[in-house]
Each structure stands twice: as structure tokens, then as C-alpha cells.
Amino acid sequence: MAELSFSMDINSIIPKGLNDENLTLDMIKAGQKVMQSSIKSAASRHRKTGSMANSVKCSKPVINRNGDAVGRVKFYGKDKNGMQNWYKAIWIEYGTKHQNAQPFVRPAIKGSESGIKSAMEQVFNEKVKWYKLI
């Protein structure tokens, strides 16, 4: 449902010798946690059983074919009645012909952008600091 990805020339910002794709994946993972928390919080307002809010999970960050670091935050699983949680989230987010849209994912992502950036910067700075100690 929500995807966090970015593309950059990693050699232009990372000091020589620190060219580590795990750094990028760790940065994505930190951003995912912030996004997950924000979406989970927003989803909890639409609580009947709590299964949708509890189903917000992060996928493992990967480097795709284009060389971009990608991490996803999605709704996994089903509720007690067998309804897919991602399906319920789409109904709430965009509405149906009988129910008005009540966006919660997009505002949660938009509201967490600065937190995501800070978390990613913190991971980067810690890694650079560690590298300078070696």
C-alpha cells in the first residue's frame, strides 16, 4: 500500500570506503519504522476489531533491478471474518459508492515525512561516525 523508495548517486554523498549498500538498506529500514508507526496510529482510529491497525508491517528493504533501495509498509493478513486487511484499508481510504472516503494512509505518510527523513539521517550519521572511528 505505502512504498518508500529513493534513488541517488550514493558515491556523491558517502565518504570513500563507506560505500556499503547495507547503509542504504538500514536507512530505509529506519524510515519504514517511522512510516509504520504513523500509519498504524492513523489506522487505529478505524478500529472495530483492531486487526487492520495491527496488520501494518514492514517488508524487508531490498535493492531492486534499477538499483533503487525499496522498502514497503503494507497491510498484511485477514480479519476474523476472512476479509483482507489491505482491502478494508482501500475502502476506507478511497471510499465506495455507499461510503465516503476517509483518507488516513496518505495523510499519515505526508505527516511523517520529516520524521522519516530524520530517522534516515540519524542512521547515516551514526554509520559515518562509526566509520571515522576505525
Regions found by a protein language model. Give the residues of each.
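Short, cysteine-centered beta-strand-loop-beta hairpins and adjacent loop/turn segments enriched
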Residues: 79-89
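Short, Lys/Arg-rich flexible segments
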Residues: 1-72, 76, 89-134
